[in-house]
C-alpha cells in the first residue's frame, strides 16, 4: 500500500505503517548478512553486534554499545535484512528466533506502531499514551478490507471476524488476553466501538431513536462507562484495571445487521470494597461521587467530599493522575441515561454506594464486664439505615444480636466486636456485588431487542494473570481462568492444527511445543484438587485454614510438580503454598479462604434488607435463601441446593460455560503485552517482554504458521472460487471430481508448487500463497469485467443506432399518414366517423377497466401472500440453522459429560485399588493382632499355672499348720518363721492377683480391641468379598463368554474355514432378523388396515345417521318452501291470466289503430339487438377473463405451494446430509477413541459395551416405533393435503357459481328496470323514444370504451403475472441449483468421509497385522484377535450411529408434529372459510327473498302500467295503426315476461342446488374433522403403547440369563394363547363381517330411499302426501339402522381389543428373540475384547523382548567400551612409564649438566664469558623442556583417572542391564502365562455362545411357526372379507 493509499487513514497513517521514504532508507542501509548478528546479554536479553572474528567454535563480536564480547558460535543468531525492519507480520521474517521477534516489536513500538501480526494472531503493546488511531476515519478505512490489504490493527481483526461470520455463517469470538495493565480493556472498547460504528454506517436509513434513550449502537458503547465505574479500580500495575471478567456478545441478523447485545460477567473482586493495598484504591464510583461534580449527590448521600473520612475507601491511594473523577462521574451518569435507567434506579444505586461508605465508619465496643459488642455511637448507622430504607435500631440489633435457628426455635446470639465488624464487611460486599450484577442484568434488558438474530461475535475481556506480594483466593480464581484460556489457545493453535494435518493425510511430523498446561489445571479443578479440597473443608464445621493447608500438603506436596512449598522472604506477607503457573510461580496466602468460599451473611440483617423501603435493595435480596430460611413445599430442595453453592463451584460452573461458548465459535486471538513496569511510554523492558512472549506461545505460533499450512479451503469451494484463474484446466462439459479439478487448476498456475498440499477434503496453503491467489483472482476479474463492460457498451451503442433507424422509419410513416389524413379530413363521412368512433368504446372500456382493477387487486393480494410465504420460509430456515447451532452445543455438552463420566470411572478404579491396598494392610494388621493375642493367651496360661501351683502350696501349708497346732508351744519359732513366710507368700499372692487382674484387664482390653478390629476387618472383608465377588462374577462371566466364544470360533472354523464366513453368518442372522421385523411390520400394517376399515364403516354409519337427520330437516324446509311457492305461483297464474285478457283487448284495439310508429319500432328493435349483442360479448369477455384469472391464480398458488414443498424437501435433504456428514466425522472420532479406551482399561470397556448394547436395543426399538409413527403422520398429512386441495377447489367452484348467479340476478333486475323505462317512454311520447335512442348510443360508446380499458388492464395484468412467474422460476432455479450444488458437495464430503473411515480401518488392520510377527505358533490366533477388534470397533460405531440416528428421528418426529399442528391450523382456517361461505349462502337466501319481493313490486307496477296502457288505448281507440303496434308490443312484452319467469325459476333451482352443495361441503368438513380427531386419539394411544413397550424392553434387558427358561415357557404359553385368540378373532371377524354385510345392505337400501326422496323432491308439487309417507318410512328405518350400528360398533371394539392383545404378545415374542440375539452379540463382543487384551499383552511381551534385546546390545556395547577403555588405560600406563623413564633420564642429564656446569664455571673462571653465556642459555632451554614434560605427565595422570572412573561406570551399567534383563525375562514368563489363561477363557466363552446360538435358533423356529399360523389366519380373514363383499354386492343387486 503506497502513501497515496495510506491517505485514507488520515492522521493515523504514520502510526500504522512505514512511509515509502522510510522503506527506501531501510533498504539502502548498509548491512552484512554474515557479520550482523544478535548476541545474548545479561541485562537486555539480546543485543545487536558485528562479528570481528571466529576462532575454534567461538565468536568475537562488538555490540552496538561498543562492547567486545566472546560467545559460543551456537549462541549467535543472524539479523534479518533491512527490508524486514518493522515488518507487519512476523511470520514473514527470514530468520525467525527470539531476538528477531523482540527487536521487530521494539522498533515498531519506538515508531508507535503498537499492533503487529504474529502468524494467525495479533500482538499489541500498551503505548501508555493516547494515539490517533481509533477515530471514525480509521474505522471507515478498515471496513471491508482483507487482512493483507491494511496495516495491523484491532479494527482489522474485528472486520475479519465480521466478514467470517457472514461468509462462513459461524459464530466468532475475539479473545483479548494478557497480563494486568497490558491494555485488554481498551482494546475491548475499541472492538465494540468498531462494531457499533459499522452497524450505524450500514443502517442509517432505518435508525430509530427512542425518546429518552440512545440508539442500540450508542447503548452498546455507553455500557462501558457504567461497567468501568462500578467494576474497575487502580491496582499496582494498572490505573484502570478491570476487577471482573466480561464476555460481551454482539448479535447480528442474517444480513449482518446489528440486532442486540448481552454481557456476562465473571468473578467481581468483592474484597476490594472493604480492603485495598497501599498503592491501590477502591472502585472508581466511590471517588467519582466524592469529586463534588454533582453537589446534590453529596447532600442526598449525607457525605463529605473527603475520601479519608471513610475507612472502606481510604486504605490506599485516593487519587489517580491519569483519571479525572469529576468528568468520569458525568460520563457514568450520562451512560445511565442513554441506557434507559430511570432516575429512581440511578438514585437507588448512588444511595447504596453511599450506604456502603457509611457502613465502613460504624464503630462497636465491648460491653462492660461482658464479651458482647454494642454500638459506639449511632450516627453512621442512622445514615446508612436512612439510605437503605431501614430502621436504624433494627439494623444495629441485627448486627450485634442476630437471631439464629437452633432446632425449631430462634435464639438471639451475642456477637463480639470482631464478629460484628466481619459481618458488616460481608454485608457491604454482598450489597455491592448484588448491585453490580443487577446493573449488568438491567443493561442486558436494555440491549435486548426484538429484532431477529442469527449469529454473534463474542469479545472476551477477563482479568489478566496476577502475581502480587500478597495473593489470595481471588488471585487463584483469576490465574486459574487464565490457565484455562491459555490452554484453549495452545490447543487451538498447536494441537488442533496439527491433528487436522494428520486427519487430512498430509505428511507432517508432530511438533511438541511443550505448552501443555493440563497438569496445573488438574491440580486446581480435578477431584482432590485445590478447589475440591477447599469445598470439602467448607462442608466440615470444625475445619480451619490450617486444616485446609495440611490437606493440601498431604495430597500434593511432593506428588505434583506444580505444587511447591514457598520460600518466605522477610518483608513480604506470609505464603502457605506456591503454584507453578505458565506465567510464573505464585505464592498464595490461604488466610480466610474458607470464609471467602462459603461467603456467609448475617441473615437477620438480610431479612431487614428484604423488607427495605428502598425498592432496589429489597429486589436484590428477594431471592436470597440462607441456611435458616424456611423451605416451601415443592421448592425446598432447589433453594437449599442453590444457597449452599460455594464461590469456587459457581466460578468453575461459569468458567465451564464460557469455555463451552468459546469452543463453539471460531476464535481470534489478540495478545496484549505490557512493555515495562513503570508505565513509561515508548520504553521496552526486554526481559519482561520476552517472558510474556514465551508464556503466550507467540514464537511457537509463528513457527507453526511458518512450518504449517494456516490457510485451507474445501475442494469444492476452491474449485468454484478460483476456477476463473484458468477455466481451460477444468473442462465445462465433463464431470471432474473436485479434488482432481483443484489439482489440475493449481498445477496449471505459475506459483510455487511446494507451498500447498492436498488433503482428503481440503487443499492446504502455506502463509501468503492464498493472498497471492486472491490477487491473481482480482486481476483476472478486473480484466473480465473490463471486457464485459466493453462488450456491453458496444451492444448499447448498436441498440441506440437501431433505435435511431427505427425512429427515422417511423417518422416517414407518420408523415405519409398525416398527408393522407389531410386529404380526407374534410370528407363528410369521415367527420361522421370521427364523431361516432369515440362513443363506441367508452362504456365498454370503463367496465373492462373496473373488472381488470378488481382482478389486479386480487392478484396483488395473492402476490403479497406468496411473498409473505417466502419470508416465512426464510425465517424458518434461519430458525433451523439456529437449532443446528444449539444441537452442536448440546453435542459438545454431551461430549463433556462423557469425558466427566470417564474421569469418574477412572477415579472409581483408583478408589478400588486403594481399597484393595487398605484391605491388604488391614489383613496384615489383623495377623499382627492375632499373633499378639496368641502371645497374651500363652502368658495368661502360664500365670494360671503359677497361680494353681501357689494354691497347692497354700493347701499344703494349711495342712502342715493343722498338724503342728498341737505342737504349738514347742514350735513357736517355727510358727513365727512360717507366719513370716506366710506373710511373704500372701504378699506374693496379692502381687500375683494384682498382676493377674491387670493381665485380665489387659487381656479383656486386647479382646475388645481385637473384637473391634475383627468388626472392622469383617466389614472390610465383606466389602472386599463383595468387590471380589463382583470382580469374580465379571471375570467368571468373561471367562464363560470367552469359552463360549472359543467354541463358536472352533465350530465356525470347522464349518466355514475362516473368520470372514463367520461374519457372513452373523450378517445372515441380522438379515433374518430384519426380515422377521419386516414381516411383523407387515402384519401390524395389515391389522391396522383392518381396524381402519372397521372404523371407516363406523364413521360411514355415523355419517349416514347425520345425513338422515339433515335430510329430514331439509325435507321439512322444502315442504314449507313448496307451500309458499304454490301460493306464489297461484297468484302469478292469476295475474298472468288477467294480463293476457287485458293484452288481448289492447291488441284488438291496436290492430284497429294501425301502424303509424312502425319505423320507430324497427329502429328500436335494431338498437335493442345491437345492445343485446354487445352485452353478450361483454359478458363472454368478462367470463373468459375471470376463468383465465382463476386459472392463473390457481396455477400461481400451486406453483407457490410446490416451491414451498421443494424448499422444505431441499432443506430436509440438506439437514440430513449435514447430519450424516457430522455423524461420519463423529464415527471416525469414535473409532479412534474406542481404540484408546480398549487399550486403557478392560473394566471400562466391559461397562461401556453393556451400556452401548442396551442403548442400541433401546434405540433400535425407538427407531422402529418412530419410523412407524413418521410413516403414519406422512400418510395422514398427504391425505389431509389432498382433501384440503379438493375442498379448496370445490370452494372456488362454489364461489364462481355464486358470483355468476349474482351477476345473473343483477342483469335480470337491470332488464326489468329497462323494460319499465321503455314502457313509460313509449307510452308517453315519440320524442322520448328519440331521446332513448341517443342515450342508448351513448351507453354503447361507454361500453366500448370500458371494454378497451378492460382489455388494456388484462394485458397489464398478464404482464404482471408473467413477471411474477419469471420471478418464481428464478427462485425455483436458484433453490434447485443451490440445493443440487450443496447436495453434490455433501455427497462428496460423505464419500471422502467414508474413504477416510475405510482408510482408518485399513490402517488399524495393518497395525494389528504387524503384531502377527510374534511367533509362528501364535499367527492364526493373532489374526483372529485383530478381526475381532475390528468387529468391536464396528459395533461401537454402529451403536454410536444408532444413537445419533435416534436423536435425528426424535427431531424429525418433532418437526412432523409441528407440521401436523400447522395442518390442524389450516384445517381450522378452512372451517372458518366454510362458515363464512355458509353466512354468504344465508345472505344469498336473503337476497333471493328480496328479489321475490322486488318481483312482487314489479308485478304491482306492471298492473299499474297495464292500467295506464288501458287508458292510452282508450285515448288511441280512434287509430288502428296504433293498435297494431301496441299488439306487437304486447306480444314482445309477453315473450319477455315468459323469459323472465323461466329465468327466475332457473335461478331458484340453481340456488337450491347450490344450497345443497354447500350443506354437503359442510358435512364433509365435519366428517374430516371427526376423522382427524379419531386418528389423533389413535396416534396418541399408539405412542403411549410404544412408550409402555419401551419400558418393558428396559425391564426385560435388566433381567438376567437365568430367566431364559421361564421366557421360553412363557413363549410357549403365549403361542397357545395367541392361537386361541386368533381363533376367537376369526369367529369375531366372521360375526363382524356378517354384521357389516347387513349394514351395507341397509346402507344400500337407505341410498335407494334417498334417491326416491330426491325424486319426490323434484315432484313435490304433484305428490305431497306420498312424500310424507316416505318420510315416515325413512324415520322408522333410520331407528332400526341406528340400533344395528350400535351393535356393530360394540363388535368392532371387541375385535379391536383382541387385535391389540395379539399384537402386544407378538411384540413381546419378537422382543425376547431380540434379547437373545443381543445377548449373543454381547458375548461375541466380550470375546473380541478379551482377544484384544490378549493381543495387547502379546505386544507388551514383544516390547519386553525387544527391550531385553536392546539391553543385551547395550551390555555388549558397554563391555566393548570397557575393553576399549582398558586398552586405553594400558596405553596411558605405558606412556606414563615411558615418561617416568624419560624423567629419570632427564634427571641424569641434569646431573651431568650440573657437573658440566661446575666444570664450565671452572673453565669460565679460567677461560671466558662467552662460553658461560652459551651454557646458561642451554640450561634455560633444558628447564623449559622439563616444565613441559612435567605438565604433560600431569595431564596423562588425569586422563588415566578419568578412564578408570569411566570403567567403573560401565561395569556398574552392565550389572544394572543384567538385572533388568532378568526382570524382563520374568515379566515375559508371567505374560505368557496370562496369554494361556486368556486362551482358556476365550474357549469357554465360545462354548457359551454356542449354547446361546442354539437357544436363539430354537426360539426363531418357534417364531416362524407362529408367523405361519398368523399367515393362515390372515388368509382366512381375507377369504371372509371377500365373502362379505360378495354378499354385499349380491344384496345390492337384489335390491
Curated annotation (Swiss-Prot):
Concerning InterPro entries, the annotation shows: Kinesin_motor_dom_sf, Myosin_head_motor_dom-like, Myosin_N, Myosin_S1_N, Myosin_tail, P-loop_NTPase, XRCC4-like_C
Occurrences of domain Myosin motor (ranges): 85-778
- According to the UniProt entry, the coiled-coil residues are 839-1935
Carrying Phosphoserine, the residues are: 1137, 1269, 1510
Q: What is its main location?
A: cytoplasm
One GO MF term attached to the UniProt entry: actin filament binding
Q: Keywords on this record?
A: Actin-binding, ATP-binding, Calmodulin-binding, Coiled coil, Cytoplasm, Methylation, Motor protein, Muscle protein, Myosin, Nucleotide-binding, Phosphoprotein, Thick filament
Region of interest: Disordered = 1907-1935
Which residue positions does Phosphothreonine occur at?
A: 378, 1282, 1309, 1513
RNA-binding is among the record's keywords: no
Biased composition (Basic and acidic residues) is annotated at: 1923-1935
N6,N6,N6-trimethyllysine: which positions carry it?
Answer: 129
Task: Provide a GO biological process annotation.
Answer: muscle filament sliding
**One of the record's GO cellular component terms:** cytoplasm
Q: Which SUPFAM superfamilies does this one have?
A: Myosin rod fragments, P-loop containing nucleoside triphosphate hydrolases
Q: Which residues bind ATP?
A: 178-185
The record's misc note reads:
The cardiac alpha isoform is a 'fast' ATPase myosin, while the beta isoform is a 'slow' ATPase.
Function of the protein: Myosins are actin-based motor molecules with ATPase activity essential for muscle contraction. Forms regular bipolar thick filaments that, together with actin thin filaments, constitute the fundamental contractile unit of skeletal and cardiac muscle.
Record-given protein name: Myosin-7
Naturally occurring in which organism (per UniProt): Sus scrofa (Pig)
Amino acid at each position: 500500500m503506497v502513501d497515496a493509499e495510506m491517505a485514507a487513514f488520515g492522521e493515523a497513517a504514520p502510526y500504522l505503517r512505514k512511509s515509502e521514504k522510510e522503506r527506501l532508507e531501510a533498504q539502502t542501509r548498509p548491512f552484512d548478512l554474515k557479520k550482523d548478528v544478535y548476541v545474548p546479554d545479561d541485562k537486555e536479553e539480546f543485543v545487536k553486534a558485528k562479528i570481528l572474528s571466529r576462532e575454534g567454535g567461538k565468536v568475537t563480536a562488538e555490540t552496538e554499545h561498543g562492547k567486545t564480547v566472546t560467545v559460543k558460535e551456537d549462541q549467535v543468531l543472524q539479523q534479518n535484512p533491512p527490508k524486514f525492519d518493522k515488518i507487519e507480520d512476523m511470520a514473514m521474517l527470514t530468520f525467525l528466533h527470539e531476538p528477531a521477534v523482540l527487536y521487530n516489536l521494539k522498533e515498531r513500538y519506538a515508531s508507535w506502531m503498537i499492533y503487529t501480526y504474529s502468524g494467525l494472531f495479533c500482538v499489541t503493546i500498551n503505548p501508555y499514551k493516547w494515539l490517533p488511531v481509533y477515530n471514525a476515519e480509521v474505522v471507515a478505512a478498515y471496513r471491508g478490507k482483507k487482512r493483507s490489504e491494511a496495516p495491523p490493527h484491532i479494527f482489522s481483526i474485528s472486520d475479519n471476524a465480521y466478514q467470517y461470520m457472514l461468509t462462513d455463517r459461524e459464530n466468532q469470538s475475539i479473545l483479548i488476553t494478557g497480563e494486568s495493565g497490558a491494555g485488554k480493556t481498551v482494546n475491548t472498547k475499541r472492538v465494540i466501538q468498531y462494531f457499533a460504528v459499522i452497524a450505524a454506517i450500514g443502517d442509517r436509513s432505518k435508525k430509530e431513536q427512542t425518546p429518552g434513550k440512545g440508539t442500540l449502537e450508542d447503548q452498546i458503547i455507553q455500557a462501558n462507562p457504567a461497567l468501568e465505574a462500578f467494576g474497575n479500580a487502580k491496582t499496582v500495575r494498572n490505573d484502570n484495571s478491570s476487577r471482573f471478567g466480561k464476555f460481551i456478545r454482539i448479535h447480528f441478523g442474517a444480513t449482518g445487521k446489528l440486532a442486540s447485545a448481552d454481557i456476562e460477567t465473571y468473578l467481581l473482586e468483592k474484597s476490594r470494597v472493604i480492603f485495598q493495598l497501599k498503592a491501590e484504591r477502591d472502585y472508581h464510583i466511590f471517588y467519582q461521587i466524592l469529586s463534588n461534580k454533582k453537589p446534590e449527590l453529596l447532600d442526598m448521600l449525607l457525605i463529605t467530599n473527603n475520601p479519608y473520612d471513610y475507612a472502606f475507601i481510604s486504605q490506599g491511594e485516593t487519587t489517580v493522575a491519569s483519571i479525572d473523577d469529576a468528568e468520569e462521574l458525568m460520563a457514568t451518569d450520562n451512560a445511565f441515561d442513554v441506557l434507559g435507567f430511570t432516575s429512581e434506579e440511578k438514585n437507588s444505586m448512588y444511595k447504596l454506594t453511599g450506604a456502603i461508605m457509611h457502613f465502613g465508619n460504624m464503630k462497636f465496643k465491648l460491653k462492660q464486664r461482658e464479651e458482647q459488642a454494642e454500638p459506639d455511637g449511632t450516627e453512621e448507622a442512622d445514615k446508612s439505615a436512612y439510605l437503605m430504607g431501614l430502621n436504624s435500631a433494627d439494623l444495629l440489633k441485627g448486627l450485634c444480636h442476630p437471631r439464629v435457628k437452633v432446632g425449631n426455635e430462634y435464639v438471639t446470639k451475642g456477637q463480639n466486636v470482631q464478629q460484628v465488624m466481619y459481618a458488616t464487611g460481608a454485608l457491604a460486599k454482598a450489597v455491592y456485588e448484588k448491585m453490580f450484577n443487577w446493573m449488568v442484568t438491567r443493561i442486558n434488558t436494555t440491549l435486548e431487542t426484538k429484532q431477529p438474530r442469527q449469529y454473534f461475535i463474542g469479545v472476551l475481556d477477563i482479568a489478566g494473570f496476577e502475581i502480587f506480594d500478597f495473593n489470595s483466593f481471588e488471585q487463584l480464581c483469576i490465574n486459574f481462568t487464565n490457565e484455562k484460556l491459555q490452554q484453549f489457545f495452545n490447543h487451538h493453535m498447536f494441537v488442533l492444527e496439527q491433528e487436522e494435518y494428520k486427519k487430512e493425510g498430509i505428511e507432517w511430523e508432530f511438533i511438541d511445543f511443550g505448552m501443555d498446561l493440563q497438569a496445573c489445571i488438574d491440580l486446581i479443578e480435578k477431584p482432590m484438587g485445590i478447589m475440591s479440597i477447599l469445598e470439602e473443608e467448607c462442608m466440615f464445621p470444625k475445619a480451619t485454614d490450617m486444616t485446609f493447608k495440611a490437606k493440601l500438603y498431604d495430597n500434593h506436596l511432593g506428588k505434583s510438580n506444580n505444587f511447591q512449598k514457598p520460600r518466605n522472604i522477610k518483608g513480604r506477607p506470609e505464603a502457605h503454598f506456591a503454584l507453578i503457573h505458565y506465567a510464573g510461580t505464585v505464592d498464595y496466602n490461604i488466610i480466610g479462604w474458607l470464609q471467602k468460599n462459603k461467603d456467609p451473611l448475617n441473615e437477620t440483617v438480610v431479612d431487614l434488607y428484604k423488607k427495605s423501603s428502598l425498592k432496589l435493595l429489597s429486589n436484590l435480596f428477594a431471592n436470597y435463601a440462607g441456611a435458616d430460611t424456611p423451605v416451601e413445599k415443592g421448592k425446598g430442595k432447589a433453594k437449599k441446593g442453590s444457597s449452599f453453592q460455594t464461590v469456587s463451584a459457581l466460578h468453575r460452573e461459569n468458567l465451564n460455560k464460557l469455555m463451552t461458548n468459546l469452543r463453539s465459535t471460531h476464535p481470534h486471538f489478540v495478545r496484549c503485552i505490557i512493555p515495562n513496569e513503570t508505565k513509561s511510554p515508548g520504553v521496552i523492558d526486554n526481559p519482561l517482554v520476552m517472558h510474556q512472549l514465551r508464556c503466550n506461545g507467540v514464537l511457537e505460533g509463528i513457527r507453526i504458521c511458518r512450518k504449517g499450512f494456516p490457510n485451507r479451503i474445501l475442494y469444492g469451494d476452491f474449485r468454484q472460487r478460483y476456477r476463473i484463474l484458468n477455466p481451460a484446466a477444468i473442462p465445462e462439459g465433463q464431470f471432474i471430481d473436485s479434488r482432481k479439478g483443484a489439482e489440475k487448476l493449481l498445477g496449471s498456475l505459475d506459483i510455487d508448487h511446494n507451498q500447498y498440499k492436498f488433503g482428503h477434503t481440503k487443499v492446504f496453503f502455506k502463509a501468503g500463497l492464498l493472498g497471492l491467489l486472491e490477487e491473481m483472482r482480482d486481476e483476472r476479474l478486473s480484466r473480465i469485467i473490463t471486457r464485459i463492460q466493453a462488450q456491453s457498451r458496444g451492444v448499447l451503442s448498436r441498440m441506440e443506432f437501431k433505435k435511431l433507424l427505427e425512429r427515422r422509419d417511423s417518422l416517414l410513416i407518420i408523415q405519409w399518414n398525416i398527408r393522407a389524413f389531410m386529404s380526407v379530413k374534410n370528407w363528410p363521412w369521415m367527420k361522421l366517423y370521427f364523431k361516432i368512433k369515440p362513443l363506441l368504446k367508452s362504456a365498454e372500456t370503463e367496465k373492462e377497466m373496473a373488472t381488470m382493477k378488481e382482478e389486479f387487486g386480487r392478484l396483488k393480494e395473492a402476490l403479497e401472500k406468496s411473498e409473505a410465504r417466502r419470508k416465512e420460509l426464510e425465517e424458518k430456515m434461519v430458525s433451523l440453522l439456529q437449532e443446528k447451532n444449539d444441537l452442536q452445543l448440546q453435542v459438545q455438552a454431551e461430549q463433556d459429560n462423557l469425558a466427566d463420566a470417564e474421569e469418574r470411572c477412572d477415579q472409581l478404579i483408583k478408589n478400588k485399588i486403594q481399597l484393595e491396598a487398605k484391605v491388604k494392610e488391614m489383613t496384615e494388621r489383623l495377623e499382627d493382632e492375632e499373633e499378639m493375642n496368641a502371645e497374651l493367651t500363652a502368658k495368661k496360661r502360664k500365670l494360671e499355672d503359677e497361680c494353681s501351683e501357689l494354691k497347692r502350696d497354700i493347701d499344703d501349708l494349711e495342712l502342715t499348720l493343722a498338724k503342728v497346732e498341737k505342737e504349738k508351744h514347742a514350735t513357736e519359732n517355727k510358727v513365727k518363721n512360717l507366719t513370716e513366710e506366710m506373710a511373704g507368700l500372701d504378699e506374693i499372692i496379692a502381687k500375683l492377683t494384682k498382676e493377674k487382674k491387670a493381665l485380665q484387664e489387659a487381656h479383656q482390653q486386647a479382646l475388645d480391641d481385637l473384637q473391634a478390629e475383627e468388626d472392622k476387618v469383617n466389614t472390610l472383608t465383606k466389602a472386599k468379598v463383595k468387590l471380589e465377588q463382583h470382580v469374580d462374577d465379571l471375570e467368571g462371566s468373561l471367562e464363560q463368554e470367552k469359552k463360549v466364544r472359543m467354541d463358536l470360533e472352533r465350530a465356525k472354523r470347522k464349518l466355514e474355514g475362516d473368520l470372514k464366513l463367520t461374519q457372513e453368518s452373523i450378517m445372515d442372522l441380522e438379515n433374518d432378523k430384519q426380515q422377521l421385523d419386516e414381516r411383523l411390520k407387515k402384519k401390524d400394517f395389515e391389522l391396522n388396515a383392518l381396524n381402519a376399515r372397521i372404523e371407516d364403516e363406523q364413521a360411514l354409519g355415523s355419517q349416514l345417521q347425520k345425513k338422515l337427520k339433515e335430510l329430514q330437516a331439509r325435507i321439512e324446509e322444502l315442504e314449507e318452501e313448496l307451500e309458499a311457492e304454490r301460493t306464489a305461483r297461484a297468484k302469478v297464474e292469476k295475474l298472468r291470466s288477467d294480463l293476457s285478457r287485458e293484452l288481448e283487448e289492447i291488441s284488438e284495439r291496436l290492430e284497429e289503430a294501425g301502424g303509424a310508429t312502425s319505423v320507430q319500432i324497427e329502429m328500436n328493435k335494431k338498437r335493442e339487438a345491437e345492445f343485446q349483442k354487445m352485452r353478450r360479448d361483454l359478458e363472454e369477455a368478462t367470463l373468459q377473463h375471470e376463468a383465465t384469472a382463476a386459472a392463473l391464480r390457481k396455477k400461481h398458488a400451486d406453483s407457490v405451494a410446490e416451491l414451498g414443498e421443494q424448499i422444505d424437501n431441499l432443506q430436509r435433504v440438506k439437514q440430513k446430509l449435514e447430519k450424516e456428514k457430522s455423524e461420519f466425522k463423529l464415527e471416525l472420532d469414535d473409532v479412534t477413541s474406542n481404540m484408546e479406551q480398549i487399550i486403557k482399561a478392560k473394566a471400562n470397556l466391559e461397562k461401556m459395551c453393556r451400556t452401548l448394547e442396551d442403548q442400541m436395543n433401546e434405540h433400535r426399538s425407538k427407531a422402529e416405533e418412530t419410523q412407524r409413527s413418521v410413516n403414519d403422520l406422512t400418510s395422514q398429512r398427504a391425505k389431509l393435503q389432498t382433501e384440503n386441495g379438493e375442498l379448496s377447489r370445490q370452494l372456488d367452484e362454489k364461489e364462481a357459481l355464486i358470483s355468476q348467479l349474482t351477476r345473473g340476478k343483477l342483469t335480470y333486475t337491470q332488464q326489468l328496470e329497462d323494460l319499465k323505462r321503455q314502457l313509460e317512454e313509449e307510452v308517453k311520447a315519440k320524442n322520448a323514444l328519440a331521446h332513448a335512442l341517443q342515450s342508448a348510443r351513448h351507453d354503447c360508446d361507454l361500453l366500448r370504451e370500458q371494454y378497451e380499458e378492460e382489455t388494456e388492464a388484462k394485458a397489464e395484468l398478464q404482464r404482471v403475472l408473467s413477471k411474477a412467474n419469471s420471478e418464481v422460476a428464478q427462485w425455483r432455479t436458484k433453490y434447485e441449483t443451490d440445493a443440487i450444488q450443496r447436495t453434490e458437495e455433501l455427497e462428496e464430503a460423505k464419500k471422502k468421509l467414508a474413504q477416510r473411515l475405510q482408510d482408518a480401518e485399513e490402517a488399524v488392520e495393518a497395525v494389528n497385522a504387524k503384531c502377527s510377527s510374534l511367533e509362528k505358533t501364535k499367527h492364526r490366533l493373532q489374526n483372529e484377535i485383530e478381526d475381532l477388534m475390528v468387529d468391536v470397533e464396528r459395533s461401537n460405531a454402529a451403536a454410536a450411529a444408532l444413537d445419533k440416528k435416534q436423536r435425528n428421528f426424535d427431531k424429525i418426529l418433532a418437526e412432523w408434529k409441528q407440521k401436523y399442528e400447522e395442518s390442524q391450523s389450516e384445517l381450522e382456517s378452512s372451517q372458518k372459510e366454510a362458515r363464512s361461505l355458509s353466512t354468504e349462502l344465508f345472505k344469498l337466501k336473503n337476497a333471493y327473498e328480496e328479489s321475490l319481493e322486488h318481483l312482487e313490486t314489479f308485478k304491482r307496477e306492471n298492473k299499474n302500467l297495464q292500467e295506464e296502457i288501458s287508458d292510452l288505448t282508450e285515448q288511441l281507440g280512434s287509430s288502428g295503426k296504433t293498435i297494431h303496434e301496441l299488439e306487437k308490443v304486447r306480444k314482445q312484452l309477453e315473450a319477455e315476461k315468459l323469459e323472465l319467469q323461466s329465468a327466475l325459476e332457473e335461478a331458484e333451482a340453481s340456488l337450491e342446488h347450490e344450497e345443497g352443495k354447500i350443506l354437503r361441503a359442510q358435512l364433509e368438513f365435519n366428517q374430516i374433522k371427526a376423522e382427524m380427531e379419531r386418528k389423533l386419539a389413535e396416534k396418541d394411544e399408539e405412542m403411549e403403547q410404544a412408550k409402555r413397550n419401551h419400558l418393558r424392553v428396559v425391564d426385560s434387558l435388566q433381567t438376567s440369563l437365568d430367566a431364559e427358561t421361564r421366557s421360553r415357557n412363557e413363549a410357549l404359553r403365549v403361542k397357545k394363547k395367541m392361537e386361541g385368540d386368533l381363533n376367537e378373532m376369526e369367529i369375531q371377524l366372521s360375526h363382524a363381517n356378517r354384521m357389516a354385510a347387513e349394514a351395507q345392505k341397509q346402507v344400500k337400501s337407505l341410498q335407494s330411499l334417498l334417491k326416491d326422496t330426491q325424486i319426490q323432491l323434484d315432484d313435490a308439487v304433484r305428490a305431497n302426501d306420498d312424500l310424507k309417507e316416505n318420510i315416515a318410512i325413512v324415520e322408522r328405518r333410520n331407528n332400526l339402522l341406528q340400533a344395528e350400528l350400535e351393535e356393530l360398533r360394540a363388535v368392532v371394539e371387541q375385535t379391536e381389543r383382541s387385535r391389540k392383545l395379539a399384537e402386544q404378545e407378538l411384540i413381546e415374542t419378537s422382543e425376547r428373540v431380540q434379547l437373545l440375539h443381543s445377548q449373543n452379540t454381547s458375548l461375541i463382543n466380550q470375546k473380541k475384547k478379551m482377544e484384544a487384551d490378549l493381543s495387547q499383552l502379546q505386544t507388551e511381551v514383544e516390547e519386553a523382548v525387544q527391550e531385553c534385546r536392546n539391553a543385551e546390545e547395550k551390555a555388549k556395547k558397554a563391555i566393548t567400551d570397557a575393553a576399549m577403555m582398558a586398552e586405553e588405560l594400558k596405553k596411558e600406563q605405558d606412556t606414563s612409564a615411558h615418561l617416568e623413564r624419560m624423567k629419570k633420564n632427564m634427571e641424569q642429564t641434569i646431573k651431568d649438566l650440573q657437573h658440566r656446569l661446575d666444570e664450565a664455571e671452572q673453565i669460565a673462571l679460567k677461560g671466558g664469558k662467552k662460553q658461560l653465556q652459551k651454557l646458561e642459555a642451554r640450561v634455560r632451554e633444558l628447564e623449559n623442556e622439563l616444565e613441559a614434560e612435567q605438565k604433560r605427565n600431569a595431564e596423562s595422570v588425569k586422563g588415566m583417572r578419568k578412564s578408570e572412573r569411566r570403567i567403573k561406570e560401565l561395569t556398574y551399567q552392565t550389572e544394572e542391564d543384567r538385572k533388568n534383563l532378568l526382570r524382563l525375562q520374568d515379566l515375559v514368563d508371567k505374560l505368557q502365562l496370562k496369554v494361556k489363561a486368556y486362551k482358556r477363557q476365550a474357549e469357554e466363552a465360545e462354548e457359551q455362545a454356542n449354547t446361546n446360538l442354539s437357544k436363539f435358533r430354537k426360539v426363531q423356529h418357534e417364531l416362524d411357526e407362529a408367523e405361519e399360523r398368523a399367515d393362515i389366519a390372515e388368509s382366512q380373514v381375507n377369504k371372509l372379507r371377500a365373502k362379505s363383499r360378495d354378499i354385499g354386492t349380491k344384496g345390492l343387486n337384489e335390491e
